[in-house]
């Protein structure tokens, strides 16, 4: 319990004001938050444009950038967090970091290797229900694989919310779901 060191990764829209606002919210709750810019200043108006740029950079390069941004802050253990695509980045890093203190996933997950093993890593996922990028079958399989890997997983579903429902600048925004998300996320971080 106390101040967590958090690295918060943006979605395929890039490092937008909503990510900075989320970081400020977490800082106001007493945490240290880093917000790496994996897209090096580029932001996008549509998810399709952002996904095309993500694919142009490539998974390996994006993970390299994420590791380089996180490494200087990881001595005492990080909480990895991210929005949508950023959640998948956060998940990859958290599952590979034996010092990881937690994983906070906002609107997105990633596949994991069959041999992934963690020691009761606390994980909290916040996801729209339904979500256009994370089907019920996918989420069920993801949950079971994370549990089998040893993670302590908590899932919060938000019926009727849009995919990136915590971003007030997008049509997906749902103020009530966003507020419930931040309340639960703050409680999760306080429990670590």
Model-derived features: positions:
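Serine-hydrolase catalytic machinery in alpha/beta-hydrolase-like enzymes
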Residues: 2-75, 164-166
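Alpha/beta-hydrolase fold nucleophile elbow
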Residues: 73-83
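Gly/Ala-rich beta-loop-alpha elbow adjacent to hydrolase catalytic centers
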Residues: 82-86, 90
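A conserved short beta-strand
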Residues: 99-109
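Short, proline-enriched alpha-helix->beta-strand connector loops that line the catalytic pocket
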Residues: 118-123, 150-152
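Short beta-strand/loop motif that positions the catalytic acidic residue
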Residues: 125-127
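Conserved alpha/beta-hydrolase "acid-adjacent" motif
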Residues: 132-138
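C-terminal catalytic histidine-bearing segment of alpha/beta-hydrolase fold enzymes
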Residues: 152-192
């Amino acid at each position: 319990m106390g101040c967590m060191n958090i690295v918060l990764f943006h979605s395929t829209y890039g490092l937008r004001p909503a990510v900075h606002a989320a970081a400020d919210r977490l800082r106001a709750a007493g945490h240290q938050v880093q917000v790496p810019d994996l897209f090096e200043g580029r932001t996008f108006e549509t998810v399709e444009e952002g996904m095309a740029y993500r694919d142009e950079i490539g998974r390996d390069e994006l993970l390299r950038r994420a590791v380089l941004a996180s490494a200087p802050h990881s001595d005492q253990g990080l909480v990895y967090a991210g929005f949508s695509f950023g959640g998948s980045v956060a998940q990859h890093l958290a599952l590979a970091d034996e010092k990881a203190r937690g994983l906070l996933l906002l609107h997105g997950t990633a596949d994991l290797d069959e041999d992934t093993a963690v020691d009761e890593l606390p994980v909290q996922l916040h996801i729209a229900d339904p979500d256009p990028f994370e089907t019920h079958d996918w989420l069920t399989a993801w949950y079971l694989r994370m549990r089998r890997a040893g993670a302590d997983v908590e899932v919060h579903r938000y019926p009727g919310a849009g995919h990136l429902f915590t971003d007030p600048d997008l049509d997906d925004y749902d103020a009530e779901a966003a507020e419930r998300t931040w309340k639960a996320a703050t409680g999760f971080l306080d429990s670590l």
